[in-house]
């Protein structure tokens, strides 16, 4: 009996020691399969995320809610919603995958809602939403896109189904962290999830996907700031009362804050230990809310996370959110939010806490969500990318890419609205921000050259002009009509991603376009590929109107390209058709689609 007790103690000590080392490069064994070569697993060392090859991680992406009933409902604003058709939804998702890859997304964040595919005991249920998760994991592996899973959220949920969390239990998130039955159900849910065999990938187990790199325990784990009534939360408050008795404490604010900190820390460590025991290579992460999180949620979750075993924390930034919530939803595009980022960086009650010693240098950090709230301006995404790097972030996912289809576009003033087709200027700013995020060193103190504009590195942005751009020797990205004095331009860019006109391209349409030089064995092959996106504008009522057929004039003014030496072809289903070129320079008419420009 004594020997068994000693052995049990040794096992606990080893698990604890291994868990503490997990943030220094631990990863489980992953049986290699075709397609794995697209990925580099990540680990944390010295509060920094690294790929297996030793390079620092810098991943830019979107929230991509393919497996959540809430997102499908959001995309169907009609009074009478059609019955969910999983095959039709997959076709929308597949097209949206192609769009976000065109926008340079490296990673997607997916909310998992037990209310969509698990019962009250945490057992997985075969639903369309679980099928969509299987499909999404498989598609990400096929396409080389990293996956960031938020394991628990309250959104979604079939009507009448009880679950650990569902759409009616937003304020019950804290109960899931303290009630014994919910804790056991959560353990069961996570164990079944990470060991699930994906039928789309020949039964591959979830935890063996090399592209699944982040396991965030819970999205926005809210707690009451004061002890709630037992009538409202009978099971949870009973746990609190038992804790008070065991610790000989009296009911009061100090006791509640102590209980809250202790239980959050216990919960974080519990899930982190469970993921370690299951040998899940994804890095565990704890969510620390939006800007002003300490004001709205108290410091307890921050204190608990700092003292916990997880090697990484996440945060979100929503310029304009508090302004919008003061009244009815409105278009905030005319307001300058650059000062907001400065305040967020400097004020501990906003997000200055990220600069505290207990986080900086102790925990890796990522951005779980960001957005320009009710705002279609194009200078803020790039400014936010610079801000995120100043805060040390290595992964950032915008909330949320809109999975839309023709006839279901969101209005201009919608709180969260990014889509390559229906918000082309904002999509261009997303691409500018991507380049800034990937090419800006971390922890450079955040500052701007002016209160309403900024110029740094290869980038420039302006609130008065509602313009941003990134230009290095190979790549040029811009969000509107660009003049040569706004930023130093390359002589001949090899890639152009733009909206509007620039010294290299004049275009009258209102959609994005992509121009890329084709190289063979390192040499320019006298061949350019051009992709033109649909024309999209907001009408007088602020509704997006997309035209997928309209033609516009495009003129190329790339140095060294004489009109007589080049020919333009439209490419459709692999077949080329010649397009007439007109003066001046290389001028031709384009409709949405693909083109090739080839030297004669």
Model-derived segments and spans:
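Positively charged n-region of N-terminal signal peptides that target proteins for export
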Residues: 1-5
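Bacterial Sec-dependent signal peptides at the C-terminal "C-region" and cleavage site
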Residues: 8, 12-32
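Active-site mouth of glycoside hydrolases
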Residues: 30-310
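Substrate-binding cleft of secreted/luminal carbohydrate-active enzymes
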Residues: 60, 373-450
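A conserved mid-domain beta-alpha-beta active-site/ligand-binding segment of alpha/beta enzyme cores
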Residues: 194, 427-476
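Charge-patterned, long linear interaction tracts outside catalytic cores
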Residues: 218, 222-229, 235-236, 457-505
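Glycoside hydrolase catalytic-domain groove-lining segments
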Residues: 254-265, 269, 273, 279-287, ...
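C-terminal beta-sandwich/jelly-roll accessory domains of carbohydrate-active enzymes
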Residues: 476-600
């Amino acid at each position: 009996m004594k020997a068994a007790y000693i052995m049990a103690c040794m096992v606990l000590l080893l698990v604890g020691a291994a868990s503490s080392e997990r943030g220094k490069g631990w990863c489980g064994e992953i049986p290699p399969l075709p397609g794995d070569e697209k990925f580099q697993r990540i680990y944390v060392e010295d509060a920094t995320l690294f790929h297996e090859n030793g390079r620092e991680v810098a991943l830019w992406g979107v929230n991509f809610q393919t497996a959540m009933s809430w997102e499908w409902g959001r995309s169907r604003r009609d009074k009478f919603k059609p019955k969910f058709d999983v095959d039709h939804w997959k076709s929308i998702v597949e097209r949206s995958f192609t769009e976000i890859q065109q926008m340079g997304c490296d990673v997607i964040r997916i909310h998992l809602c037990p209310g969509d595919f698990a019962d009250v005991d945490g057992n997985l249920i075969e639903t369309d939403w679980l099928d969509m998760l299987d499909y999404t994991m498989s598609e990400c592996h096929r396409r080389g896109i990293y996956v960031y899973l938020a394991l628990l959220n309250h959104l979604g949920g079939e009507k009448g189904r009880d679950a650990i969390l569902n759409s009616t239990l937003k304020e019950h998130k804290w109960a899931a962290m303290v009630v014994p039955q919910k804790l056991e159900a959560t353990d069961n849910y996570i164990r079944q999830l990470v060991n699930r065999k994906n039928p789309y990938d020949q039964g591959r187990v979830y935890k063996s996907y090399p592209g699944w790199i982040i396991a965030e325990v819970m999205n926005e784990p809210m707690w009451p700031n004061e002890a709630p009534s037992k009538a409202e939360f009978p099971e949870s408050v009973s746990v609190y009362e038992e804790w008070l008795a065991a610790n000989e404490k009296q009911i009061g604010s100090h006791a509640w804050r102590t209980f809250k900190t202790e239980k959050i820390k216990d919960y974080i460590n519990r899930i982190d230990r469970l993921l370690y025991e299951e040998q899940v290579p994804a890095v565990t992460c704890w969510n620390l809310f939006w800007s002003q999180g300490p004001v709205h949620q108290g410091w307890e979750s921050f204190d608990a996370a700092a003292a916990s075993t997880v090697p990484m924390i996440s945060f979100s930034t929503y310029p304009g959110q508090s302004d919008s919530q003061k009244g009815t939803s409105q278009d905030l595009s005319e307001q300058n939010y650059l000062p907001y980022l400065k305040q967020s960086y400097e004020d501990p009650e906003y997000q200055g806490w990220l600069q505290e010693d207990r986080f900086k240098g102790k925990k890796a950090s990522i951005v779980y969500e960001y957005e320009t709230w009710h705002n279609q301006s194009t200078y803020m995404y790039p400014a936010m990318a610079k801000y995120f790097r100043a805060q040390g972030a290595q992964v950032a996912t915008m909330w949320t890419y809109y999975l839309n289809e023709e006839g279901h576009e969101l209005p201009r003033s919608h709180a969260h609205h990014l889509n390559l087709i229906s918000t082309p200027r904002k999509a261009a700013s997303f691409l500018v921000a991507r380049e800034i995020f990937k090419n800006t060193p971390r922890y450079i103190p955040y500052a701007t050259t002016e209160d309403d504009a900024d110029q740094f590195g290869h980038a420039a942005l302006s609130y008065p002009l509602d313009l941003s751009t990134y230009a290095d020797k190979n790549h040029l990205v811009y969000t509107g009509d660009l003049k040569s004095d706004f930023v130093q331009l390359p002589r001949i860019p090899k890639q152009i991603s733009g909206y509007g006109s620039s010294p290299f391209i004049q275009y009258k349409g209102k959609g994005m376009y992509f121009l890329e030089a084709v190289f063979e064995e390192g040499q320019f092959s006298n061949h350019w590929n051009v992709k033109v996106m649909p024309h999209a504008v907001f009408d007088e009522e602020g509704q997006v109107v997309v035209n997928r057929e309209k033609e516009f004039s495009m003129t190329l003014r790339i140095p060294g390209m004489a009109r007589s030496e080049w020919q333009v072809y439209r490419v459709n289903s692999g077949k080329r058709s010649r397009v007439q070129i007109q003066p001046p320079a290389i001028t031709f008419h384009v409709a949405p689609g693909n083109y090739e420009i080839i030297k004669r």
